[in-house]
C-alpha cells in the first residue's frame, strides 16, 4: 500500500535517503584507497588489510540474512532511526581506532548496521512513491553511489593527505549526525505493513519461504552468477591503491585521480550501457562485458612501468566494465526470480553479494605478497582468478530461465 506525500515532502525524503546512502557507500569505499596508510601504520600484510575490507562485507551479508527475520516487524522510520545512528557510532569508532584489532571490530559493526540501510531505503521508496514515478525516484537515491565515487572518495582522500586517516571517518560520523536530525523531520511513519503475528510464527514463515527460494534450481544458478559477477572485481579492486603506490610510484595525493576519473567515466557510460541493454538485450550485453572483464583486470595488475595517463586509462576502463556488467546482470538476476518470491530472493541475493565481496577481498589478500623492495607480488594471479569468475558468470548467464516479459530481452 502506497502512502502518498506532498511533492515537496517527497523531494526532501528522497534527498534524505540519498544522503543516507552516500554516507553508507563512502564508509565502505574509503577503506580501499586507505590501504597504503593502514598497512604501514599498523604493520600489517596485504592479506590482513584484505580482512579489514572483507570484515565489513561479511558482516553486511550476515546482517542482511538476519534482517529478513525482523525487518517487517517494525515501522520503517523506527528501523532507519535505530540502525542509522548506530552506523554513525560505528564510523566514529573507526575514526578513534588505536589498533588493528579495534579497527576490525569497528568495521564489523559498520557492516552490520550499514548493510541493511539500502534495503530499508528501497522499501520506503516503494511504499511512498507511486509505481509510475518509482524509477525516477529510485534513480535519485542510487546517484549516491556515483557521487560517492566521483566526489566522496577524492574529498575523503584530500582529508587524509591534509590531516590523517581518521579524518574521513570523523566526517562521515558528523554527516550521519546531521542526517539523523533531518530524517526525524522528513521520514514518514510507515506502519501499514505491520501484522500482529507472534515472533515464532514470523520466524517459521521466514524459514519456510527461505526453503522455497533455495530449492528452486533456477534461483541457485542466479545466486551462483551473482557470486561470480561480484567476485570478479573484488579480487583485485581493493588493492589498486596499494599496488599503485608500491609498484607504480603513485604518490598519496595522486590516488584520488583513479577514483575521480573512474567515477566520471562510469557516470557517463552507465546511461549508454543501460540503453544498449534495453535495445540489444540484457543477456547479450552482459555476456559481452563479462568476456571483456578479464582484460582490464589483468592489465591493471600488470600496469607498473606504464605512464601515469595510461594507468589512469586502464583503471577507468576497469571501473566502466565492472560497473557496466551490473546493469544488465542485475536485470537478469531479478528476472530469474519466481515472481511470487522475488522479495525474499532479492534480499538473499544482496546478502550473497556482500558475502562474495568479502570472500573475494580475503582471497585476493591471501594471494598477494611483497618482495624485498616492498613491491606487491602475484597481483596478476588475483586478476586471473577474478577473470575466471567473470568467464564463469558468462556461462551461468546463458543457463538462467527468465520470467515474464524478460524472456524476450
Model-derived regions, located:
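Juxtamembrane intracellular "pre-TM" segments in multi-pass secondary transporters
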Residues: 2-7, 189-223
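Helix-breaking motifs and short loop linkers at transmembrane-helix boundaries and internal kinks
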Residues: 43, 75, 96-102, 249, ...
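Conserved MFS/SLC helix-loop-helix module at the cytosolic interface between two early adjacent transmembrane helices
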Residues: 62-101
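Helix-loop-helix hairpin linking two adjacent transmembrane segments in secondary transporters
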Residues: 140-187
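A membrane-interface helix-boundary motif in multi-pass transporters
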Residues: 161-173, 366-388
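C-terminal transmembrane helical hairpin of 12-TM major facilitator-type secondary transporters
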Residues: 283-329
